[in-house]
Regions:
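Conserved, function-critical positions that sit in or immediately flank catalytic
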Residues: 85-160
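Extended assembly-interface regions of large multimeric machines
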Residues: 1-69, 74-112
Length: 160
């Protein structure tokens, strides 16, 4: 027995949704507009934020570079965020399907969910890997920045 999710094969030229826990929730300050994925999904279950490659590796999309088409297949099993170039997607390796999982739980419509102990051990509870800037302002420096302090009082979270 295995938990399964809809199968989503990586295909070049597809715009993938990036992972966001609040698809379908009201946009801040609105009572009529909801957070919608690039695919039009209004629920995380329907969003195309993960892919299965022909290497039988599963990746989660952390950033789709502003909604451009994915043209480079994510590869590798590193615990670091994988950036594909030139499309600019950022992916997180999640797990690989074993031969037994492929035989028993991989169909044209569904695929097994598995836990990779190496990935799980390398994760940090509460880590923030990607930050989306809503309004950038001016005077900043473009690029990747590390060691940014996150300050907040815990209010406004959707899932305490």
């Amino acid at each position: 027995m295995s938990i399964v999710i809809p199968r989503r094969n990586w295909t070049t030229g597809t715009v993938y949704d990036y992972y966001r826990h609040d698809y379908g929730h009201y946009v801040t300050g609105s009572t009529s507009s909801v957070v919608t994925a690039d695919s039009g999904a209004t629920a995380l279950y329907d969003a195309t934020f993960y892919v299965l490659t022909d290497d039988n590796n599963v990746y989660k999309c952390l950033d789709n570079n502003g909604g451009v088409a994915s043209t480079v297949k994510p590869t590798g099993t590193s615990n670091s965020i994988l950036t594909t170039s030139p499309d600019g997607y950022k992916w997180k390796y999640m797990y690989s399907l074993s031969a037994a999982q492929q035989t028993n739980f991989l169909s044209t419509d569904f695929m097994a969910v598995a836990t990779n102990s190496t990935v799980a051990a390398a994760n940090t509870d509460g880590a923030i890997d990607i930050v989306k800037i809503k309004t950038a302002g001016s005077g900043g420096t473009d690029g990747t920045h590390t060691g940014i302090s996150i300050k907040g009082d815990g209010s406004g979270e959707l899932f305490p």
